[in-house]
Structures are given as C-alpha cells and as structure tokens.
C-alpha cells in the first residue's frame, strides 16, 4: 500500500511540474519521423503480441526491462513521458498496474488508443490452495459511531491472463483491432499478422492439449510462485505450489515445504517445477529431500536480457514449456 501511495505521489508531481513538456522520447521521435505509430507496452507478453502484429509498422517500447522483477515495478518520470507521447498504450490491467489509472486520468488521451487486456478475457479471482503460503494482507479498518469494523475486502483478480494460450489469442486479436482503428492505412497488415501469430499460438495450444489428454499424471507441483492459474484451468490440470502468482515471498515455511514434499511422495511425482528468473531455492530443497527432478515452466512474465536480445517470443517460450510439460506429466 505504501509503495502504491509513493507511485501516485510521484506521478502527480511529474505531471504537475510539466516534465512532459521536455523533449520527446526517442521512440516517439523515431516513430514520427518514420511515419509510424508509437506503441508503449508494460510487460513482455504484451510487447511480444504488439511486435508480432505491428511488424515494421510501429516503434515499440517495453517499460519493464528484461530480467526486472515485474511485481516491484514503478514507473519512472521517463516512463510517464513515454506513455503520454505514445499513440498506443497497452497494459494488462491487474493489481500490478494499479498506477496506470492515476497516470491516464492526468493526461489528455483523446488522441491515444488505450488497451486494457483484462477486458478482452474473463478474469478469475486469485486463489490460495491447500499447502500454499497465504499472502500477508494489510488489515484496514473503518470506524463507525460506536465500533470499528473491517473494511470490505476488494476482489483481486489473477492478472496472469496470457498463460492460457486461448486467452493469448483473444489478446492478440484485441490489439490487432485497436491498431487497425488508429492506423487504418495498415489495417490489412495488422489483421494478417494477427492471423499468422494466432495460428502459431493455436498450434502450441493443440500440442499441449494432446499431451495433457494422454498424460497419466494431471498434478503439477511448484516449489515457487504459481502464475499459471489460467493455464491449468484451460487444460484441466491440478496444482500445488509454495506461493500465489503475485507473491513477493521467497522463503517458504516448514509447513509449506513439508506439505509439498508429502504431496510429491504420496502421488509418486517425479518432478518439481520452478518458474523463470527464480532463485530455485525452494524447488531445489524439495528435490533434495524427495529425489524429484527439477523442471522449469516459463510463465512468459519476463525474460532474461540474453533471451530478449536473441528474439525470444511468447510462442518460442511456450514451445519450450511443451517439452518440460510432456516430461513432467509423463511422470517417468
């Protein structure tokens, strides 16, 4: 909560003192001089979808840099300028994007296309399953005339919507429609590029569905955060994990470790999973105590700089996941 207040204050200060009146950011300049649209995105999957659709018709910016911790990202003054000067701003719209509304409310967005991708899918509430470390919630109270009552709890939706390939297809199509509207001259290009990319995503989706259908094991155990709610919901998989998807915790309690170890032993699970950019400490501890092998399942939330520079995409990462999913579900 305190971090969000600081972000809000910083945003208001930047806009109030007119920092946005400074020279244009490089991406916006390049886009204008080349006759292209300028697109600003928040995180990697959004950037990748926009890249695939726009092709060479846009200048792209990703605010959260490769290898950065997405859940602790705060927009810098330079980031705010980039958003204000962009033709298109694309974001997820979940808990970690709480800062976006303050920025947009303080800007003239009449000539800008704003795309909130959670509006393109059916979001589900965050959940804590058995054995998982519960997140520490800030206790907020409201005072009435004679007593203090807990404030109504806001519903928090799981923001990792892109982990479902079917959702990813919806997101790609949403972006394509928006780009065609703001840049009708290249509408046919955007439509074709979106069709090509969704076909690639669908191919991966079909392959995963086939693996799951043939698998003797339908349970995934994560010694890590779990950002795959939409993924397991789509494919009908069960899971156990140390932390929810947006948790910033890195150390599990003895109770959580014991629960995950017992789950592996009781179900004869051969592999424990960890996610990208993880220190793998919990997964390694579970592996050492149970003999389970280690496998990565990449949520595509962010990538390393090397992977980014090498041209990693949503599809290429999901194709890597296919092999580790096949291995884990085969349980051999």
Each language-model region and where it sits:
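Sec-dependent N-terminal signal peptides of Gram-positive bacterial secreted proteins and lipoproteins
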Residues: 3-25
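Extracytoplasmic metal-acquisition and chelation regions
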Residues: 9, 22-332
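Compositionally biased, low-complexity segments enriched in small residues
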Residues: 1-2, 144
């Amino acid at each position: 909560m305190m971090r969000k207040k600081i972000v809000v204050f910083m945003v208001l200060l930047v806009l109030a003192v007119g920092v946005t009146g400074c020279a244009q950011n490089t991406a916006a300049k390049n886009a204008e001089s080349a006759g292209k649209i300028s697109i600003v995105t928040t995180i990697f999957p959004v950037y990748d979808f926009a890249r695939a659709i726009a092709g060479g018709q846009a200048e792209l910016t990703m605010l959260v840099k490769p290898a950065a911790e997405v859940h602790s990202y705060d927009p810098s003054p330079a980031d705010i300028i980039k958003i204000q000067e962009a033709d298109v701003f694309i974001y997820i719209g979940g808990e970690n994007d709480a800062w976006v509304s303050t920025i947009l409310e303080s800007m003239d967005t009449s000539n800008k296309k704003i795309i909130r991708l959670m509006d393109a899918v059916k979001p589900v509430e965050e959940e804590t399953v058995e054995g998982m470390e519960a997140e520490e919630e800030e206790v907020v109270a409201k005072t009435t005339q004679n007593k203090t009552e807990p404030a109504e709890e806001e519903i928090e939706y799981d923001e990792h919507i892109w982990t479902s390939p079917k959702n990813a297809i919806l997101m790609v199509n949403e972006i394509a429609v928006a780009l065609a509207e703001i840049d009708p001259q290249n509408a046919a290009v955007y439509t074709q590029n979106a069709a090509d990319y969704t076909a690639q995503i669908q191919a991966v989706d079909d392959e995963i569905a086939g693996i799951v259908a043939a698998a003797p094991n339908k349970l995934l155990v994560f010694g890590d955060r779990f950002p795959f709610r939409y993924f397991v919901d789509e494919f009908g998989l069960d899971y156990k994990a140390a932390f929810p998807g947006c948790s910033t915790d890195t150390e599990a309690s003895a109770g959580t470790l014991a629960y995950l170890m017992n789950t592996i032993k009781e179900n004869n699970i051969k592999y424990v999973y960890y996610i990208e950019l993880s220190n793998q400490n919990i997964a390694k501890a579970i592996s050492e105590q149970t003999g389970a092998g280690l496998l990565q399942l990449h949520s595509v939330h962010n990538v390393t700089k090397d992977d980014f520079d090498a041209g990693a995409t949503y599809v290429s990462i999901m194709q890597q996941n296919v092999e580790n999913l096949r291995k884990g579900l085969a349980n051999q």
